[in-house]
Amino acid sequence: MSMAPIVLAAGGTGGHLFPAEALARELLERGHRVVLVTDVRGTAFGDALREVPVHRIRSATLGGGLLGKARTALELGIGTLQARRLLSRLEPAIVVGFGGYPSFPAVYAAAGLRIPVAIHEQNAVMGRANRMLARRARLICTSFPEVQGMDNVDRARAVRTGNPVRPAVLALRDRPYEAPLPGGSLDILVTGGSQGATVFGEIVPRAVAMLPEDLRLRLGIVQQARAENLQAARDGYAALGVQATLAPFFRDLPERLARCHLMIGRAGASTVAELTVAGRPSILVPYPHATDDHQTANARAVAAAGGAWIMPQPEFTAEALAARLTALLTDPAPLAPAAAAAAAWGLPDAARRLADAVLGAAGLGNGRSTPDSQMRAAE
């Protein structure tokens, strides 16, 4: 067991916190001490892993205008001083950052103290915080084979580990995809969260209404929808004779994913990781306002492997979706190969790979090489 702790720096959204939690679990199982440095949004992390001490420091997202940028710089500066004092006391073996501005103070402070640094990038486009920190990192772990925003110097220190998923999703690896039968039902899961529920709530019911009745009645819909739109959506599907289950949030989403023949949703890093680990085909509609359009890059990677179809939001019309659904209802044969391609692309052992890489960079052993340890960087 290492007496020096391994510090994880993550905060903000779940997309940054989920992989940190997965790495923490893996490291704890191997007998290592783990500490989390986070912002106010990540303090609930301790509820999931009570063995992990949680330290909150100041941070901020990038503000607009001169005043906003000045406030961000001030908050990050204060956070860096707090992190420097904390790390000087903890003397960690390595600090691992998971992107986003909440990770910046701890990683930047670690580099200044000459503590080994690793960063994990969840998307196919390197985030702005990770770009600023990349040159200070001994190790860059990526989720995609190709990552935009990296140069050759970064590439030499990069390893594809994948993006760890929740245990409930990982368990789906043992549940093979059951392809729909010709002339049988087609079960569709529609997700989207706060940034997707509105567009999917408008387009999907209209597309279903355009289908011939004999095809429409073969559909089963499970769909996330905003609370204020639930009743109207239920009434609309009922009038069409379509079996539909709608809710603002599904606590059993992994189980819903396991049962579906096709998923329609966004292309965030966590969504892509879960789809590919589960081995489920999808129609991906990238969120058009994502920073640096990273969701389009995410979707293209899976589509290029044959595991998904991309519909950019301007092209995600009721008519276009109806045509796609008609084709799959008429001939579902493409779904099984797409599911297999998604599964082949995914890395179900991402937590193990990430732990191996981090421990190797810290000089703590357990750093086993993996077949996918080489990656390419798209400049």
Curated annotation (Swiss-Prot):
Catalytic activity: di-trans,octa-cis-undecaprenyl diphospho-N-acetyl-alpha-D-muramoyl-L-alanyl-D-glutamyl-meso-2,6-diaminopimeloyl-D-alanyl-D-alanine + UDP-N-acetyl-alpha-D-glucosamine = di-trans,octa-cis-undecaprenyl diphospho-[N-acetyl-alpha-D-glucosaminyl-(1->4)]-N-acetyl-alpha-D-muramoyl-L-alanyl-D-glutamyl-meso-2,6-diaminopimeloyl-D-alanyl-D-alanine + UDP + H(+)
Domain of life: Bacteria
Topology in the lipid bilayer: Peripheral membrane protein
Enzyme class: transferase
EC number: 2.4.1.227
Gene Ontology biological process terms, A to Z: carbohydrate metabolic process; cell division; cell wall organization; lipid glycosylation; peptidoglycan biosynthetic process; regulation of cell shape
Lineage of the organism: Bacteria, Pseudomonadati, Pseudomonadota, Alphaproteobacteria, Rhodospirillales
Pathway, per record: Cell wall biogenesis; peptidoglycan biosynthesis
The organism of origin for this protein: Rhodospirillum centenum (strain ATCC 51521 / SW)
Name of the featured protein: UDP-N-acetylglucosamine--N-acetylmuramyl-(pentapeptide) pyrophosphoryl-undecaprenol N-acetylglucosamine transferase
InterPro entries named among the record's database cross-references: GlcNAc_MurG, Glyco_trans_28_C, GlycoTrans_28_N
Subcellular location: Cell inner membrane
Purpose of the protein: Cell wall formation. Catalyzes the transfer of a GlcNAc subunit on undecaprenyl-pyrophosphoryl-MurNAc-pentapeptide (lipid intermediate I) to form undecaprenyl-pyrophosphoryl-MurNAc-(pentapeptide)GlcNAc (lipid intermediate II).
Pfam families per the UniProt record, alphabetical: Glyco_tran_28_C (PF04101), Glyco_transf_28 (PF03033)
GO MF entries: UDP-N-acetyl-D-glucosamine:N-acetylmuramoyl-L-alanyl-D-glutamyl-meso-2,6-diaminopimelyl-D-alanyl-D-alanine-diphosphoundecaprenol 4-beta-N-acetylglucosaminlytransferase activity; undecaprenyldiphospho-muramoylpentapeptide beta-N-acetylglucosaminyltransferase activity
UniProt entry tagged with the keyword Transmembrane: no
Keywords assigned: Cell cycle, Cell division, Cell inner membrane, Cell membrane, Cell shape, Cell wall biogenesis/degradation, Glycosyltransferase, Membrane, Peptidoglycan synthesis, Transferase
UniProt: UDP-N-acetyl-alpha-D-glucosamine binding residues: 13-15, 123, 166, 194, 295
